[in-house]
Amino acid sequence: MILDSVFSIGNILPSAIQIGVVFLLGCVGEIIIEKSGNLNLGIPGVMCFGATGGALGCSIAMKIIGEGDPNYLLVVFFGLFFCLLFGAIAGLIYSFLTVTLHSNQTVVGLALTIFGGGFANFLMNIIDQSKLSVASKLIKAKLPFADSLGVFGDIVFGHGILVYLALGIAIAAFIVLKTT
């Protein structure tokens, strides 16, 4: 009986969608990179850089704003900005090594993956993680009417804004790649 509630569709599908969004964003980026003629095996490392940058940005924003009644939306946008910044820096490292220095794309990509994972592990031990749950609660906020629709509402509308943003990015990338 306990396993029935754990392995129900209403529990598995929303979690699978939220986890799958991470892979969706990485795959969209890799498809665009491959269309340009490069093979970037360092996408997981770039994603680690971005995630670490997002956590660092949220931590810095919480320290700047203070303990009072912070503007959580500002914290999330600060985290997203740092996430994009760190991901762009990792992409610039990859492009400098492969395009400018003509290094092997496979070797550089795998090295970036290993370095990104190690960088994330190192920096996440330094960051004060006690305040990061505030930003994650706002990112995971559901649409208000999702609970009234039952299981269907949880599966389709029970996700944070970044899930829908990622789906929009994937659809936009599909349209751009298909029509150009």
Model-found features: residue ranges?
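Membrane-interfacial amphipathic/re-entrant helices at transmembrane-helix boundaries
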Residues: 1-26, 35, 39, 53, ...
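Alpha-helical transmembrane segments in multi-pass membrane proteins
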Residues: 18, 22-30, 46, 50-54, ...
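Membrane-interface helix caps of multi-pass small-molecule transporters
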Residues: 32, 56, 60, 64, ...
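Short, non-helical or kinked segments that cap or interrupt transmembrane helices
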Residues: 34-53, 99-112
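Juxtamembrane/interfacial segments around transmembrane helices
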Residues: 65-70, 129-143, 160-165, 170
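Alpha-helical transmembrane segments within multi-pass membrane transporters and channels
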Residues: 67-119
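Extracellular/periplasmic helix-loop junction at the C-terminal end of a transmembrane helix
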Residues: 117-154
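Alpha-helical transmembrane segments of multi-pass integral membrane proteins
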Residues: 148-180
